[in-house]
A protein has these predicted regions:
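Hydrophobic small-molecule pocket/channel-lining residues, especially in calycin-type beta-barrels
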Residues: 24, 40, 81, 91, ...
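Glycine-rich portal/gate segments that line the openings of hydrophobic small-molecule binding cavities
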Residues: 52-96, 149-157
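Beta-strand/loop substructures that line and gate deep hydrophobic ligand-binding cavities in soluble
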Residues: 95-145
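Hydrophobic ligand-binding cavity/cleft-lining segments
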Residues: 3-56
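Eukaryotic helix-grip
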Residues: 40, 44, 83-88, 122
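Beta-strand elements of well-folded, non-transmembrane domains
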Residues: 26, 72-74, 123-125
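A short, structured loop/turn motif at beta-sheet edges
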Residues: 25-29, 81-88, 106-116
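Short, surface-exposed coil-to-beta transition loops
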Residues: 17-19, 73-78, 99-104
Length: 159
């Protein structure tokens, strides 16, 4: 399921959002563990060339800074802005010059060893709107692929 929407407040554009949800036959704790190990599978996205970070301990923690290099060579300075273990949700902020990104990922337990993977990516401000006007198709494809790669990695943790 994919949504592409604009968020407005008092008629003023705030950001363009890409929202994707996927129901998977994976226990919720495994899906959450896979998300927490995103540093392993993020480089597998076709839109990414690499993920660089200081290997000092746990990757998945609030305040963790890292760089994601796109296949086009753009380096996004990223930070795990918040981690909500109780609700199995993270928020990541990233930027490259004037381009800013807000990414939220969440796992929802549906019972019977099934869960929903959710990813929402937004690009705030007019610069984000201009960026998505040119790169919207790429971003919507990445949104879907992100959940597929996350799911595939989670399946490797089942064994």
């Amino acid at each position: 399921m994919y949504y592409n929407t604009l968020i407005k407040t008092q008629g003023e554009l705030i950001m363009k959002l890409y929202i994707e949800e996927k129901v998977v036959n994976i226990p919720v704790d495994i899906a959450w563990k896979a998300l927490k190990e995103m540093n392993v599978w993020l480089p597998k996205l076709s839109t990414n060339k690499g993920v660089d970070y200081d290997k000092d301990g746990v990757f998945f923690k609030q305040g963790r800074k890292y760089k994601v290099t796109s296949k086009e060579g753009v380096v996004m300075d990223s930070e795990i802005y918040s981690v909500d273990e109780a609700n199995m949700e993270i928020e990541i902020h990233a930027e490259h010059k004037h381009l800013k990104s807000i990414l939220k990922c969440r796992v929802i337990d549906l019972g019977n060893k099934t869960c929903k993977l959710m990813r929402t990516q937004g690009y705030p401000g007019w610069f984000g709107v201009i960026f998505t006007a040119f790169w919207g198709k790429r971003e919507s494809g990445e949104t879907a692929e992100y959940l597929d790669v996350w799911e595939e990695y989670a399946k490797t943790l089942l064994n």
